Amino acid sequence: MANGIYKVTEDFEKALSEYTGAKYVVTVDNMSNALFLSLYYENHIEENIKDGFVTCPKRTYPSVPCEIIHSGLKVEFTENYGCLDMEKGTLKGAYKLGNSNVYDSALRFTADMYLKGTHMCVSFTGPYKHFKLS
């Protein structure tokens, strides 16, 4: 289907790649699945999560710890939200799921936002998003 839904998706992924600076972009149906796939890949394919747990903020959406568990890992809650400013080397509106290379970037979508070697999960739905698709 050269001009069907697959072409639209491919064009969208390419535009996201160019905008964010990521070499690869994969679109999925929602943020929960993006987190699950990224954590599963980190845990089962790359085997980067050696001790079997991932930290996340105590105050987050319920889907975040659920996807950590769903990917075969254990959750450790923390007070550290990891949402500092870029001058300090961290991202405002995003946080790293500790002990992994996965970022929950649900509230951040900016040009050249990609951090090399990470899996940055971005969401386009919800009331606080910068780029609304729904």
Residue ranges and their predicted role:
Residues 1-33, 41:
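Conserved N-terminal alpha-helix of the aminotransferase class I/II PLP-enzyme fold
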